[in-house]
Amino acid sequence: MPTTNEADERMRKFKNKGKDTAELRRRRVEVSVELRKAKKDEQILKRRNVCFPEELILSPEKNAMQSIQVPQLSLEEIVQGMNSGDNENELRSTQAARKMLSKERNPPLNDIIEAGLIPKLVEFLSYHNNSTLQFEAAWALTNIASGTSDQTKSVVDGGAIPAFISLISSPHLHISEQAVWALGNIAGDGPLYRDALISCNVIPPLLTLVNPQTPLGYLRNITWTLSNLCRNKNPYPPMSAVLQILPVLTQLMLHEDKDILSDTCWAMSYLTDGSNDRIDVVVKTGLVERLIQLMYSPELSILTPSLRTVGNIVTGTDKQTQAAIDAGVLSVLPQLLRHQKPSIQKEAAWALSNIAAGPAPQIQQMITCGLLSPLVDLLKKGDFKAQKEAVWAVTNYTSGGTVEQVVQLVQCGVLEPLLNLLTIKDSKTILVILDAISNIFLAAEKLGEQEKLCLLVEELGGLEKIEALQTHDNRMVYHAALALIEKYFSGEEADEMNALEPEVGNDAYTFQVPNMQKESFKF
């Protein structure tokens, strides 16, 4: 259940009747401020270079893979060797330290830091006449920077940023790649170090590496590092940096490798997770159609960030949303609302909820593309988080849609699953549902079919559920439920409803409808 602050923020940004259009779309609320660990469907913040028992190390001198024996040394021996001033001892000790830091489980990062070895490792990065030592030091520092924020800080404080940026241009490809990897870990720590890297002019040398001659594995690392430079907000990356990186991301979006596509789409999702001006910069690249193509991908690692990016775009202006509609987003959303993965259902419903916050012509395009039926199905039997997004979609739709559009949604069977969700514990979602029900009643009033809607709500068990909310702990829920009952289910309305009590015919309910043609009923 969302926190009060999170839910209030969401309600504040939710489309309401009479509000300015800038308030009509909701932004993604990020609940957690702590660093997320790698999930299967989320991009990795930091990565360690892990070694295996039979080590293969690229020898810069021979440009070939060689099996090497790394000595087992104690930490004390490593400290002595790295400070010995003897080239051979420095290399052996640095390799031993790197091996310690490359253990798959529980590498002793803090032991190495507390031994005061970081300044020496950074110094070794400048040993251009000993590329093997450079590489080993770069690898060791990469793994320290892959740790906690404090561990990354120790690498930065040791002066590693300018040293690694210098190594991007190393003539030895594997050293250059290790430097890019380390910089990706530093950028992934958060906006402070991301901006420190940008201030040190990291972007131009990185961009020169994106060319047809770059090996695939290396290009994957570069793409991941570029995506980390686009990541994080509070503050967002400087717009000048975004404009530098975007043309290269545009090229990478056309690549065929799934890892490169995944990281490029994540970069796009970060760049669109902000103000309308930031969304506009991405929309103007002409990439929206390509993003929507990637939403058809069977690879979850590509589908998730491309859907997130398009979802961010439709939080923007009506014009930006229309760009996504024109590129075909409404054709792919039905299958995503029925996706086997609940997280995809939720993201698709979130995107749809923001499209539904648009003007009636955009809502009509939703109807034309067959989105009402999968939306109602999701309300009926989706994962709870996806159902909550579907509720927002329905409420936005009923707020901005025409009477005829609201009628079409009701005819698709939206009322029953909507009313059934009134028994959940989430107060804010209940309020959103009550808002949708109120909107549907307003449409019924305009058609003169309020009484029939009252009967339908009662027949579906909705009146009982709304009445039960009058004892709800949340005062806003209590007042909203009471307002609905007093307006539509009491006094004269109740008498009129009784007069319309359905009689059971041979195969259906029939209504006693004085002075009205049955054909006029639309619900």
UniProtKB/Swiss-Prot annotation:
ARM repeat coordinates: 109-151, 152-196, 197-235, 236-280, 281-320, 321-362, 363-402, 403-447
Disulfide bonds listed in the record: none
Entry keyword set: Cytoplasm, Protein transport, Repeat, Transport
Single GO molecular function: nuclear import signal receptor activity
Residue ranges of every copy of the IBB domain listed in the record: 2-57
Bias-annotated ranges (Basic and acidic residues): 7-22
Disordered: annotated span: 1-22
Main location as per UniProt: cytoplasm
Annotated localization: Cytoplasm
Domain of life the protein comes from: Eukaryota
Any one annotated GO CC term: cytoplasm
GO terms under biological process: NLS-bearing protein import into nucleus
Assembly with partners or alone: Forms a complex with importin subunit beta-1.
Family: Belongs to the importin alpha family.
Job of this protein: It is essential for selective protein import into nucleus. Promotes signal-dependent binding of karyophilic proteins to the nuclear envelope.
Record protein name field: Importin subunit alpha-1
Organism: Xenopus laevis (African clawed frog)
Lineage: Eukaryota, Metazoa, Chordata, Craniata, Vertebrata
